[in-house]
């Protein structure tokens, strides 16, 4: 069994100062006026954001917040994997691995972990407690870098070993949005003897036969039309990620603008105001994880890796994920959910919840709604641990 080592995040002072200096020196006078958020990240907001970054943002405070949880490092398949492991309250907390996506990080779940692990501290029942495992994806954040692009299926294999061989869980639940939804799907598909159930708040997988019937075909047409506008970043990162990285690795402002555009465009905002949902500290801390670890490059590799793994099709034979699956359907999800009839052909859907609000970053946007749905799903599993 591989060694598990306690890990404390500490970014050198000189790294923080270098980042601030680069942000402060950005040549704003060379930026043309823009059209709000229509052409990309809003110029006026970007200036305000960077002024806050340089004069008010406190990385040390946010770093300490991450370190409040039990952080660890281990090695799986010769890749260092960083993870938070918060053991739940009570006699029988259910093991739960939560995977982030891009452009997310473990920061998405900082307001989420304690609520899941210790519900009795927040007005809930100890019977709903989870052992919460939140890893940094390979190539992301504080985890090590794979030798070449890894897709979500390979990452699922790594996380399966993390949960079973490293942490010793016989059975566990997997949850995720964005790439975390794909990773959770592969955990349920490839590792059903250990992954007892999955809960997803995005549909990234596709059935080999495509949409059937008028309702599904109409969804597919709307989806493809929307992706003409939304797909630019994905095409770049899935084909030539290295080229983009030369610019981003040299520009903290560039990384911030690239990520902020997605946080703005993929979220359920009030009057288009990004700070109606997120604080500047939340946004900056998520961005800073990419910058201080210099992982913008390798984090984008996952898009290339999925292409090499065969894309979105779950099974060329038309098989589905047979472990019980919970689906939290948020209305402003970037990848609009298809009709349930389509999802039923890919997953054994045990719970389907159409949410009243929320978008792509559900754990940050609507943590209470997502947590309630995860708890309900786990309660309704017939037995725990389920028989393999």
State the predicted function of each range.
Residues 147-166:
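Alpha/beta-hydrolase active-site loop
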Residues 102-114:
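The serine-hydrolase catalytic nucleophile loop
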Residues 115-122, 166-219:
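Conserved hydrolase catalytic core segment
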